[in-house]
Amino acid sequence: MLAYRSPSRRLQRPGGALLAGALVSAVALLLTGTGAAAAAPPSPDEPVRSGHAWMGAGTRIEQGPASSAAAGITPMDTSGVQGIDVSHWQGAINWGSVKAAGIDFAYMKATEGTSYKDSRFNANYTGSYNAGLIRGAYHFARPNVSNGATQAGYFASNGGGWSKDGKTLPGVLDIEHNPYGAMCYGLSTTQMRTWINDFYNTYKARTARDVVIYTTAGWWNTCTGGWTGMSAKSPLWVAHWGTASPAVPAGFPTWTIWQYTATGRVAGVSGDVDRNKFNGSFARLQALANNTP
């Protein structure tokens, strides 16, 4: 920590070396796209503040925050088309460095519930696009706050839209173990199915795309009762850390994206970041972005 200096001393000689150094530092931050180290998400025994959940905030309740490390699996153990998912918890990101590290796609948090917009979404969405990544947005579901249609509309209006520009992936419904309370948000399996279907239908009507579903096998099988109703409509993004092959929820024939660790490292990102693998070639990733066969 820097030693304290009185304001009067720090403001002396505005044309001097102190001011010049500050200006150089500010310019360097703008040029590199990096900033102060990101704040770490709450530890497993700390509550998550409303609006501040992230992709995997509930998954860690099921699977443990360090299960990838415990299994000895490192990010580079998985080859193929690689991606990351981020939120405000990662702070400022140097997307040029991320791209240079071999990352092809990224998803970033846009919204949660009906009132929260991620503070880093605009910077992440624009920065990743400018760096040449294929990117998309995700919505952290709060089924106990409103119906699915309302949240899908909020998401589509605040970052979850889609355009056929070759760089925009369909939006994601992040629906996982509730990090704020009861696992299934107080809904029955029938109510949860209705909620998810309403979200899907509204998002489809707004964007003409099938929403991607992020979940775990454990949550889906418990909270939807192993529902098969989405398997022919939504691509599956499954979270399963610390394993060589992910468990797929009932009803889904396979996975499209696999989040295989919550403790990955990538140049340009401060601290841990979720790492993901796309199930297919880069050409297939482009096809998903363009909505082509």
Question: For each of these PLM feature ranges, what is it?
Answer:
Residues K167-G251:
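Catalytic domains of cell-wall/extracellular-matrix polysaccharide-remodeling enzymes
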Residues M1-A40:
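Secretory targeting and sorting signals
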Residues N94, N147, C223, V248, ...:
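Short acidic, gly/pro-rich beta-turn/loop elements at beta-sheet edges
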Residues P41-G91, G229-P293:
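Functionally critical loop-and-helix segments that line ligand-binding/catalytic clefts
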Residues S6-R9, H88, W95-A100, E176, ...:
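Short alpha-helical interface patches
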Residues S115, N144, W220, S245, ...:
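Flexible, glycine-rich phosphate/dinucleotide-binding loops
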